[in-house]
Amino acid sequence: MSGVFAEGEKALFIDSKQRRYLIQLNKEGEFHSHAGFVPHTSVIGTLPGQPVESTKGSKYIVLRPTLEDFVIEMPRGAQVIYPKDLAPMCMIGDIYPGARVFETGVGSGALSMTMLRYGAHITGLELREDFM
């Protein structure tokens, strides 16, 4: 992904206190907080890193989320493995580009996304319907 933000894309809003909010952009959507709201249309079509202002004058920097941002801010249905633990797990597990991995209990998908970033090919098995 490069260039301007598009509808359907994830965006990371960061306020003046460095609080982070992961949002999926859509033309009718609005990001609401205690500091007013920002229509998604004021982000769609702009470049990452541009400031946007809420209706109450609060400023946010809007960026494309990294894998780490997504893992930290994602909704939690299962126990999440945090970025500080993911890299050592991949190293100990000898995950490398082209490795074939069978993952049982995919859960939130944080480990799967990290192994994919390392270039592994993953087959996952999840029994719980609410994690699919």
Regions found by a protein language model. Give the residues of each.
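Conserved SAM-binding loop of SAM-dependent methyltransferases across substrates and taxa
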Residues: 108-120
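Conserved SAM/SAH-binding beta-strand->alpha-helix loop
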Residues: 128
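Conserved SAM/SAH-binding loop
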Residues: 82, 107-108
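Conserved class I S-adenosyl-L-methionine
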Residues: 96-107, 123
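Conserved SAM-binding loop and adjacent beta-strand
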Residues: 3, 72-87
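N-terminal auxiliary segments of SAM/dcSAM-dependent transferases
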Residues: 1-64
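Short internal alpha-helix immediately C-terminal to a glycine-rich phosphate-binding loop
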Residues: 84-101, 112
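Short alpha-helix immediately C-terminal to the canonical SAM-binding loop
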Residues: 132
